[in-house]
Amino acid sequence: MVAQIRIGQGMDVHAFEEGNFVTLAGVQIPHTHGLKAHSDGDVVLHALCDALLGALALGDIGQHFPDTDPEFKGADSRVLLKHVYQLILDRGYHLNNADITVACERPKLAKYNLEMRQSIADVLNVDLNQISIKATTTEKLGFTGRQEGILATATVLISH
């Protein structure tokens, strides 16, 4: 039997607000601001959830965890990711790899890269080498360049 291969792509954006850390890939990173959101505002995990859901045409994160539902107020996005990945597993698929890009001027993320990758690998129970995270800037252009927020994109390859 030929393997069933699916690709998913996701994106998320959150604006900065008052605070002293951001949560990215389940890791709290010190910063001069927090991220405005109904949940913990983890743009990395939200983009990854959308990529996984998109790979099997299962909707998007907002359909599964609406920001109008008080149950998800302040929710830990690792819990959301675990739920989404279980939907993938329940359909007989597994993650081959995830490639994530985070765009922001600040905070600088290089020293948190391994910890962020490991956090995702732990939630999904996959090998570290299946998770890639890259950080970039937008050369001071756009809302991320003006340090108004953070953007993350994720692409996944899953197979059955």
Curated annotation (Swiss-Prot):
Keyword annotations from UniProtKB, A to Z: Isoprene biosynthesis, Lyase, Metal-binding
Example GO BP: isopentenyl diphosphate biosynthetic process, methylerythritol 4-phosphate pathway
Coiled coil: none
Binding site for 4-CDP-2-C-methyl-D-erythritol 2-phosphate: 12-14, 38-39, 60-62, 65-69, 136-139, 143, 146
CDD domains per the UniProt record, alphabetical: MECDP_synthase
Annotated a divalent metal cation binding sites: 12, 14, 46
Function description: Involved in the biosynthesis of isopentenyl diphosphate (IPP) and dimethylallyl diphosphate (DMAPP), two major building blocks of isoprenoid compounds. Catalyzes the conversion of 4-diphosphocytidyl-2-C-methyl-D-erythritol 2-phosphate (CDP-ME2P) to 2-C-methyl-D-erythritol 2,4-cyclodiphosphate (ME-CPP) with a corresponding release of cytidine 5-monophosphate (CMP).
Molecular function terms from GO: 2-C-methyl-D-erythritol 2,4-cyclodiphosphate synthase activity; metal ion binding
Highest taxon of the lineage: Bacteria
Required co-factors: a divalent metal cation
Site feature location: Transition state stabilizer: 38, 137
Pathway field: Isoprenoid biosynthesis; isopentenyl diphosphate biosynthesis via DXP pathway; isopentenyl diphosphate from 1-deoxy-D-xylulose 5-phosphate: step 4/6
Note on how the cofactor is bound: Binds 1 divalent metal cation per subunit.
UniProt-listed Gene3D superfamilies: 2-C-methyl-D-erythritol 2,4-cyclodiphosphate synthase
Name the UniProt record assigns to this protein: 2-C-methyl-D-erythritol 2,4-cyclodiphosphate synthase
Reactions that this protein is recorded to catalyse: 4-CDP-2-C-methyl-D-erythritol 2-phosphate = 2-C-methyl-D-erythritol 2,4-cyclic diphosphate + CMP
Lineage: Bacteria, Pseudomonadati, Pseudomonadota, Gammaproteobacteria, Moraxellales
